[in-house]
Amino acid sequence: MENSEKTEVVLLACGSFNPITNMHLRLFELAKDYMNGTGKYKVIKGIISPVGDAYKKKGLISAYHRVIMAELATKNSKWVEVDTWESLQKEWTETAKVLRHHQEKLEASICDPQQNSPVLEKPGRKRKWAEQKQDISEKKSLEQTKTKGVPKVKLLCGADFLESFGVPNLWKSEDITKILGDYGLICITRAGNDAQKFIYESDVLWKHQNNIHLVNEWITNDISSTKIRRALRRGQSIRYLVPDLVEEYIEKHNLYSSESEERNVGVVLAPLQRNTTEVKA
């Protein structure tokens, strides 16, 4: 299939990235190889979208630091970048809305190829919008974009994210339907995760199974942000588990400790609080 006939895809990964790890970066590479390998798609960009502070997850440090670490991790990437829109929202933003934002941003780029992303300032200062440098090589002319059509945003995640759809009140059923029906999911499965069975046992996932791409991770990697934070609390090395620049940044700012892990303890996770309140209402 010629490139002009392939559907261009933008991979969007939402999450805490607390901190970002080498495994997060591997998800993009695995998904890109798989999607390009189908012969139907061409992955043109990857976007990392750190969640805002209003998510209220236990141990979640400031979005300012999480965004910077993600930017350091992707500094040498030619196709994966960090977007700060979600992290700047005062309230927690549903994943479906984040997907819609990026899809609309792509559509708007047809008329205005120069799209800017907000930048976080240090905690305690007023957040403001500012222009962010863009790689000139990634810009496309108006005519090229019109010819190829608007790229499709698809959500990139791990198997644990997929299985979270089954947690009561964590997701609105209509949001799951919108994510799967309007955008699609690319799920990297780990050893021990039976994602196919989970899809089979869920009516809504089964209905949209053709828009769920399961990618096997043959070279297994069990790195997680939780394990990284645990190692740091215990004074253990995280070398080769996170990008070197991220490790240096964490050490310089002493980001993770027993105290930071207690942040938001006793606070109900934002989606659970919102969805539970709406159910009662």
Swiss-Prot record:
It catalyses: beta-nicotinamide D-ribonucleotide + ATP + H(+) = diphosphate + NAD(+); nicotinate beta-D-ribonucleotide + ATP + H(+) = deamido-NAD(+) + diphosphate. Residues 129-143 have a biased composition (Basic and acidic residues). The keyword Transcription does not apply. It comes from Bos taurus (Bovine). Belongs to the eukaryotic NMN adenylyltransferase family. GO terms for molecular function: ATP binding; identical protein binding; nicotinamide-nucleotide adenylyltransferase activity; nicotinate-nucleotide adenylyltransferase activity; protein ADP-ribosyltransferase-substrate adaptor activity. It is found in: Nucleus. The keyword Transport does not apply. Its EC number is 2.7.7.1, 2.7.7.18. Residues 113-143 are annotated as: Disordered. A motif (Nuclear localization signal) lies at residues 123-129. Disulfide bonds: none annotated. ATP binds at G15, S16, F17, H24, K58, G158, A159, D160, T226, K227, I228, R229. It is an enzyme of class 2 (transferase). One of its GO terms (cellular component) is nucleus. This is Nicotinamide/nicotinic acid mononucleotide adenylyltransferase 1. Divalent metal cations. Zn(2+) confers higher activity as compared to Mg(2+). Catalyzes the formation of NAD(+) from nicotinamide mononucleotide (NMN) and ATP. Can also use the deamidated form; nicotinic acid mononucleotide (NaMN) as substrate with the same efficiency. Can use triazofurin monophosphate (TrMP) as substrate. Also catalyzes the reverse reaction, i.e. the pyrophosphorolytic cleavage of NAD(+). For the pyrophosphorolytic activity, prefers NAD(+) and NaAD as substrates and degrades NADH, nicotinic acid adenine dinucleotide phosphate (NHD) and nicotinamide guanine dinucleotide (NGD) less effectively. Pfam families: CTP_transf_like. PANTHER family: NICOTINAMIDE MONONUCLEOTIDE ADENYLYLTRANSFERASE, NICOTINAMIDE_NICOTINIC ACID MONONUCLEOTIDE ADENYLYLTRANSFERASE 1.
